[in-house]
């Protein structure tokens, strides 16, 4: 097993890619903390993992609340004694708005979830990792963090920021046995579109030009396999990279 007895937090793990990552990590032997705002969904994932012989517990976490993040890490260490891997997966979509249509409230919320919460989680995790002498961070970002036409301006900017945060963190702690990498999924079958409201007709029309080039929609389990690799010792020499998984969509 690639992650035997590793302790892993996965945020946004009640559904979609987070669920697949949590389940995949458990299958590879990790003890998983299933974190999500949707506690019932998180419990269902944790219970399914335990039913299959794995180890997991669920915790309700609003990643925009500092006290929830502190509790998440405190409960993890209290329960398992340490943290080996942090998977920042929680995220929300914008409404495809170009910059002239963005409201301050939308911008602030997108950044609170997609960027600031990631930074705060990494800040707590790196303190633990420095004390332990090791640790791994896997940020599930987006092809929108590498390109300009995969979402609206707010989502795109929020994900570009996480790319920079990922690379800077990898550099800063490369001599401390701490790795930080990212995943840039293309179109994947998840429920993230449920977070979209007041969708921009202009933005959808422009973004749709690129969708015509997409060879296929990916499955959450395909992203989970990459997250397993990056979290494992198989990726011990990989640091500061953002790996695209999109079936060749962005090669054009």
PLM region spans:
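Residue(s) in the substrate-gating loop at a strand-loop-helix junction
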Residues: 142
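C-terminal helical subdomain
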Residues: 182, 201-234, 238, 245-247
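Active-site helix of classical SDR
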Residues: 122, 158, 166
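Substrate-binding pocket helix/loop in short-chain dehydrogenase/reductase
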Residues: 97-99, 103-108, 208
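Short, small/polar-rich loop/turn modules that mediate ligand/substrate recognition or access, typified
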Residues: 174, 179, 238-240
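Canonical Rossmann dinucleotide-binding motif of NAD(H)/NADP(H)-dependent dehydrogenases/reductases
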Residues: 3-33
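Short C-terminal tail/terminal secondary-structure segment
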Residues: 93-96, 147, 228, 239-252
């Amino acid at each position: 097993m690639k992650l035997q007895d590793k302790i892993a937090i996965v945020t946004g793990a009640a559904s979609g890619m987070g669920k697949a990552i949590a389940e995949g990590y458990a299958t590879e032997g990790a003890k998983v903390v299933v974190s999500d705002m949707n506690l019932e969904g998180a419990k269902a994932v944790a219970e399914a993992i335990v039913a299959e012989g794995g180890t997991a517990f669920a915790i309700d976490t609003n990643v925009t609340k500092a006290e929830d993040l502190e509790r998440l890490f405190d409960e993890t260490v209290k329960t398992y004694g340490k943290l080996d891997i942090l998977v920042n997966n929680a995220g929300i979509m914008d409404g495809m708005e170009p910059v002239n249509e963005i409201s301050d409230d939308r911008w602030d919320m997108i950044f609170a979830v997609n960027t600031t919460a990631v930074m705060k989680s990494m800040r707590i995790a790196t303190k633990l990792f420095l004390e332990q002498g090791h640790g791994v961070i896997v940020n599930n970002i987006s092809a929108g963090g590498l390109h300009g036409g995969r979402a609206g301006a707010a989502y795109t900017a929020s994900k570009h920021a996480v790319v920079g945060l990922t690379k800077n963190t990898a550099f800063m702690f490369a001599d401390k046995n701490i790795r930080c990498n990212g995943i840039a999924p293309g179109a994947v079958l998840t429920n993230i579109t449920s977070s979209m409201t007041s969708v921009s007709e202009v933005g959808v029309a422009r973004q749709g030009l690129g969708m015509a080039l997409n060879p296929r929609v990916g499955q959450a389990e395909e992203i989970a396999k990459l997250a397993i690799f990056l979290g494992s010792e198989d990726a011990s020499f990989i640091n500061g990279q953002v790996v695209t998984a999109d079936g060749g969509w962005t090669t054009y």
